[in-house]
Amino acid sequence: DEHRWFKESRKSRDNPYHDYYYWRPAQYIGKKRLPPNNWTSQFEGGAWEYDSNLDEYYLHLFAKKQPDLNMDNPKVREEVKNIMRFWLDMGVDGFREDVITYISKTPGLPSVYPKLPAANGMQHYSNRPDVHRYLAEFRRDVLSGYDCFVVGESPLTTPDIALRYVTEGENKVLDEMIAFSHMEADCFMTDFVPRPFDLKKMKRAFTTWQKKLEGKGWNALYIENHDHPRIISRYGSEQYWKESGKMLAAMYMLQRGTPFIYQGQEIGMLNIALPRIDMYKDVMTMNAVRLASKIMPAKKVLKLVHDRSRENSRTPMQWSNEANAGFSTAAPWFYVNGNYHTINVRDEDADPDSILNFYRELIRFKKNTPTALYGTYRELMPESRELYVYEREYEGKRLMVVCSFTNKLVRFELPERYDLEKAELVLANYEHNFVIANGFTTRPYELRVYLWG
């Protein structure tokens, strides 16, 4: 709401920028003022914010400081094209298009279940028919003239929805689409409604996307971003920090698709545990605190924030063991994780066995191994609640990835058609990797990657 366009849009109803956003008149029942419809925000409360100067509301599907651009207005789409050209001419490699399936709304912005005071209006703004048309317009008028990459992102995206946008051919409008389902293995819909980690649920999510997109589109692979806690603290183990950090890296990066690495992930950055709730700033965290405080004691609310806040992944990058983790000589926008003395780029760069150097090795391996790039995907042992095992196969060569998600010792055995003695161990996070009777006992959070052929 601090952008020049928006400031202009709220000056008057006939301002040229007024229709750059979804401004609608207030409704009145007697003297009672009501918003234009009953849609709720994705964060909390209603999706409309009142402006007394205009006696109108503007639409914000997320925070009130994030008014929705009216992409249904052709003038706005032309502005977006100019922005794209500006950055592409500056040399950027592409764009991550946030909640891209929300960019078109049902004409008239009708209420959902009009008799209800509030309702989720997603049916009127998610995956509307014009979304594909607008993205095709961007691709035709701008992106096709550059060597660039575009990845889309949006909640509740299924493989079938993604294929509308990423299927190879003339209807392709995005290079990849980010999925969320594998990040729901320890929660119900949102990180702030936790449940015990379910490895089978995570595996099903990965496998579904791998198989559904095979031969049709390309996967966007990730396990960390700015909207989730740190992955070692979440799906791995801080006790087995190095082992689980390496295992998680190979687990997702060796699947079929393009791996995304979030800042700090490559050095194994962990969640931050601040001593007081008022030290947190994020709007989603504060909304969760307000709701949780109604049903939970303060200590449990603080523990929930420690485990689930997005700010776990928004602490300054840990470059060295110097002040402010070497990020800046000035005070940064948020607290530095106190473990920067031991988890930082400079120290890990000098340590051949570090998580950072494992990521480098893993990237080299993926880039130089056609099976890891182009191979088909097949999950093995889908019923296991402790091991995630899958294979990739390409031109007669087979790659097998074995990942332990527990601190327990687990016996792993392969069928006779797989002979581990004839395979090359190409990646591992432990030394002394013995094979006994065509199998082995996995150590806590162990990783092994074997290659045949």
Which residues fall in each region the model found?
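Short secondary-structure boundary/capping segments
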Residues: R4-K11, P110-K115, R164-N171, G236-Q239, ...
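Acidic/aromatic-lined carbohydrate-recognition and catalytic surfaces
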Residues: D1-R85, D89, Y102-D160, Y165-T167, ...
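Active-site clefts of carbohydrate-active enzymes
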Residues: N120, G217-Q239
